[in-house]
Amino acid sequence: IIDDTIQSTGLVLKVKGLFYPVRDCAVNTILNRAAISGNALKKVERNVYARIINECLKVAKGEALLRLSEGKVSAVLGGDCQDYAVLDMEQVFLHAVQYLNQNFCGCTYLGGFYEHHMASALWELSGEDKLLEAYREELMLHDRNAEEMKPVVRITTSDTGESGVNIYPMLLSGNRNDTIALGNPIRLKHKAGASMAGFDSNLQLIYGKYEVAIRGLSELLRIAILNPINCMMGITRHLGISQKCRMEAVELFKAQYGEEPCTAHDIYYGISEILYMMACDGAEGSRITKMEETIARALSVDWKEFDVPGNIKW
């Protein structure tokens, strides 16, 4: 543990006379607790860095809540009653399994991941054909192939302040089971007053959220795009997707569909190819999950704003 810490953060935290190595995912929470930030912190020597944090922690107000995992500090969170609310990770998934099995026919666990700062699980909601019935009809009305699709739901949580308990409606599409994100998640933040009862209430919103999300995806079929490459580049840049990812997605889109006019729906599926590329490259589950949420934000942008002609240097 010590050797690993020396190679990563190089920091230990002293708490009530005991010393705990600091994990990578804890650094931002410590900086937040100390109320400091800035790129310059990354450039100073490690002993100077530690001294700055120590001086700021001395004047930090309130209590702190530590998350310890496998001998290391994974997070330093607000410990006052109005700050961070603990939502037990095991209970989150137990409640989710119970609700999904009771309310969705043919619910099947597909997989998940656990990392030091995040855990996630994915379930297929097979047997709920009505969830996709309207979407399939829209696809056929627009001469699109209503290929094999499965409604799925992802539930993600963190006990290090990385995220709240989030419920994501999603699709698996085609033979490869490509992931298609369906908009913003149902969120429960780890704020004062958050409880498992609140999470149970959010679980009851899944069906309605799915119907709304599917309508949002269907709306993209009605948005004609005259300049798909510029539009795709503009959207992905607006979302903050890295140049490497967006260039690879655009090149794949050009190879498959060319540069002829299409719909926003076609481009959205093209952008979603980034998720498959990341999975093939062996990206961590948390990185893929974050990218799913990033791509989903495209459902709420003004696509016409990015449908511009000309040879634009991106």
Map each language-model feature to its residues.
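Feature for intrinsically disordered/low-complexity regulatory segments and propeptides
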Residues: 1-95
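Intrinsic disorder/low-complexity polar-acidic segments
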Residues: 77-78, 84-314
